[in-house]
C-alpha cells in the first residue's frame, strides 16, 4: 500500500530521516546537484522528470533526468544549485523551505559528485510549465504507484568486452525509460517515500536515512547474461 507521503506527517517523517545527512552534505563541496521534485498531479503523488534536449552536446543529450546541473561559484550550496537550475530549466521557482533534505550523493562516470535534493513542490500540471527549449525537450511526471509496480522495474547489466562492470536499476513503461543515475536517484527516493513497499535488489543502493527501511532482495544473477534473466535489460 502506498503511504501518504504528501501528508504533513509523511513530510515530517522524511525530513527527520534526512536531517543528519542533510546537515553533513550541505557543508561539503560537490560538482553538481539535481532537484527531485515530489509533486501532486491531479491528486496523485508523482516525481517530475525532464527529457534533456537532443540539441545539447555530450553523452547525456536526450536522456531522462531530474532538473539540475553543475554547481556555480556563486551558489551558496548544493540546495541553491538545484533550485537555481530548476528555475532556469523549467521556470519553476521552488522556495527553499520546500526542500525536505538531501539524498545520498551519486557519482557520474567521471567520478563527479552529484547531490540529489528532495523537495515537495505541491500540486502541479507538467504541461503548464514552460521549459527552456535549449536545455529541455519535454517535462513529464511518473506516479509513485507506477514506479512501485514490479512490472515497471528492471535492471541493466553494463558489460564491456564480455566482462561485467556494474548493474543499475531502470524504470520502464512510462513516456520514456528512466535509467542511469536518474534511476538510482529514483530508487533512493522510493526507499524513503514508500518504506516497506519498494524493495531494492541491489546491495549498496540504499538511501541515507533509509538504511533500516529497505532490505535488498536476492542479488541478481548472471551479470553478463542479462538476456537470460527475466525482467532485466542488457546494457552495453
From Swiss-Prot:
Function (record text): Acyl-CoA diphosphatase that mediates the hydrolysis of a wide range of CoA and CoA esters yielding 3',5'-ADP and the corresponding 4'-phosphopantetheine derivative as products. Hydrolyzes short- and medium-chain acyl-CoAs, exhibiting the highest activity toward free CoA, hexanoyl-CoA, and octanoyl-CoA and the lowest activity against acetyl-CoA. Exhibits decapping activity towards dpCoA-capped RNAs in vitro.
Keyword Manganese listed: yes
Alphabetical list of PROSITE patterns matching this protein: NUDIX
PANTHER family associated with the record: MITOCHONDRIAL COENZYME A DIPHOSPHATASE NUDT8, NUDIX HYDROLASE
Gene3D superfamilies: Nucleoside Triphosphate Pyrophosphohydrolase
GO terms under cellular component: mitochondrion
Motif (Nudix box): 70-91
Cofactor annotation: Mg(2+); Mn(2+)
Quaternary structure (record): Monomer.
Protein name: Mitochondrial coenzyme A diphosphatase NUDT8
Residues at which Mg(2+) binds: 85, 89
InterPro entries to which the protein is assigned, alphabetical: CoAse, NUDIX_hydrolase-like_dom_sf, NUDIX_hydrolase_dom
Similarity comment text for this entry: Belongs to the Nudix hydrolase family.
CDD domains: NUDIX_CoAse_Nudt7
Top-level lineage group: Eukaryota
One GO term of the biological process aspect: coenzyme A catabolic process
Key words of the record: Hydrolase, Magnesium, Manganese, Metal-binding, Mitochondrion
GO MF assignments: coenzyme A diphosphatase activity; magnesium ion binding; manganese ion binding
Catalytic activity, reaction form: an acyl-CoA + H2O = an acyl-4'-phosphopantetheine + adenosine 3',5'-bisphosphate + 2 H(+); CoA + H2O = (R)-4'-phosphopantetheine + adenosine 3',5'-bisphosphate + 2 H(+); acetyl-CoA + H2O = S-acetyl-4'-phosphopantetheine + adenosine 3',5'-bisphosphate + 2 H(+); butanoyl-CoA + H2O = S-butanoyl-4'-phosphopantetheine + adenosine 3',5'-bisphosphate + 2 H(+)
Location of the Nudix hydrolase domain: 25-172
EC number: 3.6.1.-, 3.6.1.77
Modified residue annotations for N6-succinyllysine: 70
Localisation: Mitochondrion
Amino acid at each position: 500500500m502506498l503511504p501518504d507521503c504528501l501528508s504533513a506527517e509523511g513530510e515530517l517523517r522524511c525530513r527527520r530521516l534526512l536531517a543528519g545527512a542533510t546537515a553533513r552534505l550541505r557543508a561539503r563541496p560537490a560538482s553538481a546537484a539535481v532537484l527531485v521534485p515530489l509533486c501532486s498531479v491531479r491528486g496523485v503523488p508523482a516525481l517530475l522528470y525532464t527529457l534533456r534536449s537532443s540539441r545539447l552536446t555530450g553523452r547525456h543529450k536526450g536522456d531522462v533526468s531530474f532538473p539540475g546541473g553543475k554547481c556555480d561559484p556563486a551558489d551558496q550550496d548544493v540546495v541553491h544549485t538545484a533550485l537555481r537550475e530548476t528555475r532556469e530549466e523549467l521556470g519553476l521557482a521552488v522556495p527553499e523551505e520546500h526542500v525536505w533534505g538531501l539524498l545520498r550523493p551519486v557519482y557520474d562516470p567521471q567520478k563527479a559528485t552529484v547531490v540529489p535534493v528532495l523537495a515537495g513542490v505541491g500540486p502541479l500540471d507538467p504541461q503548464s510549465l514552460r521549459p527552456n527549449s535549449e536545455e529541455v525537450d519535454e517535462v513529464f511526471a511518473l506516479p509513485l504507484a507506477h514506479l512501485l509496480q514490479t512490472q515497471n522495474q528492471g535492471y541493466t547489466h553494463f558489460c564491456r568486452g564480455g566482462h561485467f562492470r556494474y548493474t543499475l536499476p531502470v524504470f520502464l513503461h512510462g513516456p520514456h525509460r528512466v535509467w542511469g543515475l536518474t534511476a538510482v536517484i529514483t530508487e533512493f527516493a522510493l526507499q524513503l517515500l514508500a518504506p516497506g513497499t519498494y524493495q531494492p535488489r541491489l546491495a549498496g543502493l540504499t538511501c541515507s536515512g533509509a538504511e533500516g527501511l529497505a532490505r535488498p532482495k536476492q542479488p541478481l544473477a548472471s551479470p553478463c547474461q542479462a538476456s537470460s534473466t527475466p525482467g532485466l535489460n542488457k546494457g552495453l
